């Protein structure tokens, strides 16, 4: 049962609302991106290496610039490309070809039920997905579980955030953007490292175990956790 103080539920996307096995999804995603970028002179391996380099730079971002600025700065340095030419190509990819990566993900009809059910009960619902993708890439992935950007009061993407998971400052940034206190929020995610970083800001956490990521073998006995369906019961939606 949700604590009476909670007014806002923060949902992770990948592995939480959208079931996936990360390695399979990433391989599919990079394969599609390499096909898109090939006509622009990018060989697959250097392209993937440059994207990873830009992604790692975003993960280390310290709040001094938006994540997209950090990504494009590093990516263009690594490739010698120009953002003004490449950014529209990437955005077009996330609108179109990226839909092919849906095949690497699972179905979750309960995602829409959870978001709509919580909103019907008066909760604010935030999409607290790691902001390493552009907004259009988030929108595309949401569509695979029947949701839209407009279903959330805040969506974290690389355009509007300056930190990433697993930095606790990411959760502080959410609190600033929503005007909420930590005890008013609940973080719902599947990563026992990245999502539990919310605890360092005083935000309670519920871990979804269907696609659980627990690389450090953390003892979950002290945390509320369960399948997505069990979360619905926990939230009073079933």
Question: Locations of the language-model features?
Answer:
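Hydrophobic alpha-helical core bundles mediating ligand binding, dimerization, or RNAP-core interactions
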Residues: 26-34, 51-56, 72, 90-98, ...
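A metal-dependent, Asp-based hydrolase signature
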Residues: 45-95
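Residues at alpha-helix caps and immediate loop-helix transition turns in enzyme cores, especially N-
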Residues: 22-25, 29, 107, 137-138, ...
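Active-site neighborhood of HAD-like aspartate-dependent phosphohydrolases
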Residues: 1-50
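Asp-based, Mg2+/Mn2+-dependent phosphohydrolase catalytic module
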Residues: 1-9, 116-117, 130-133, 138-238
